[in-house]
Amino acid sequence: MRDPENVLNSLQEHSAQSGYVYDRLYRNLFNREFFLRAYQNIYASQGNMTAGTDGKTIDAMSLERIDRLIATLKDESYQPKPSRRTYIPKKNGKLRPLGIPSIDDKLVQEVVRMLLESIYENSFEDASHGFRPDRSCHTALRMIQNRFTRCKWFVEGDIKGFFDNIDHNVMIGILRKRIKDERFLRLIRKFLNAGYMEDNQLHQSYSGTPQGGIISPILANIYLDQFDKYMAEYKKRFDRGNKRAVNVEYHKLSAKRIRLKRKLAKAQSEEEKQSLLESIRELDKVHKSIPCKNPMDTNFRRLQYVRYADDFLIGIIGAKEDAQAVKQEIGVYIAEQLKLELSEEKTLVTKATDRAKFLGFDIRVTPQSNHTKKTKSGSTARNYSGHVMLEVPTSVIQKKLLELGAMRIDVRNGTEIWQPTYRGKLVGRTDLSILDQYNGEVRGFCNYYAIANNRSKLHKFRYIMEYSFYKTLACKYRTTKGKIIAQYRIVKDIGVKFQDKHGNERIRLLWKDSLARDPYPLGKEADIIHKPKGILKKPSLGARLKQIGVNGAEKKLQRW
């Protein structure tokens, strides 16, 4: 059997060739080495230690079990088990269904995922950022900040119930364009049709991908890559003109200024010179208050597009009618070609100087400015306008603090007052556990909004969380907040002393890193287009699995 890394590298070589068709993919599922690699990948994920409908976890894996699984794949008797449905909370307070596959299904899905990623990753559009290696919400937001400059309108897009409404026939049809292997496609259809178990009842799946399934993200991207490519072609048709037309009034004033400067050079008397200088100064004030290009040039249009999962944002340089036409046309395409529907309440045409919502941020374009300012050299220059601002909404901070139970809102004289409060659910924990809980929550929230232009707003979030921490410890020890601050003060910081496993005293401090804006929270390399590198060689787990499987003994792995 070929080394999986060589197989995946070979598949990647043709990934960017849109017309290349792959065949004989299914035979890779007979390769034990692929399953050992899949085992390594899954074992690294704590969430994949959750038992599926078969009641087993990855720790129960053995070589014999892998061989039996391969045998069922060879004769196509393999049938995925219905996933066990559970629910996780969403940001809006509702619950999101999540399917937990059996461990055998996780392994097969991971092998399929590796194959699909090698085939498709290099062919995905640059505008796609969700569920991709080296891509994130931050890379999507940076693309918006870099490319949506001077946009006049936003089209906020949201596909209604995307993961639950993916059409299975459309999905297989899209895959068939690049994959000529019916056994491989039948396997994917089996996963799509596997259904789920809830309250001991089987529910069949007629559309959608299993949320929680390992292959769901890559299948979702393959599906919506059709929309990404449609938008790339739409942009080519939409864009018009090489540059904006000149502003006639601006250039008239420029010509007038030149004439005045010439007169000044020829002026004889001091009185005439002063008069001309005053005229030039007055002219400069008007000159610098109007744009040099015509911002309403109907012969200049631009469209920008960014997508993260089923949310997308379109920026338009053009008229409102252009933005409305874009919204209507993409709605028709999504309905007719992808059998999906845009959410009417979430798909909006928004003026760019107002605020569009995307990935938890408020996004706006700074309005046209007629003001000038002094530069470091002492000259005057026009304030730059039209750049994109990424902002953390106050409502998001408020909602997060209320969800965590870290504050209450009092109303005094009609004004809301945010008050830190203790968190009763944490009182029973150790001091170190309480500190770690707060540190993790503050660090995670602040790091996500590191790219925000108004990141200073996070000081209030951290302040509320800090004093909620004090009040939680005060509640635990039935004392006052002031005494807690004095007791846990370590020089200028606040921290908890504890002993490590060797009995040495350690100190962990309350998180107070800088809240200065970080435009590259993941590093500049995060914006570089990803090139798949195959599978990293990590032989330890596979080698251990082989040792356990010696002589065909059915031995279970223990966690190490």
Label each PLM-derived region with a short phrase.
Residues 1-560:
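Non-catalytic terminal/accessory segments
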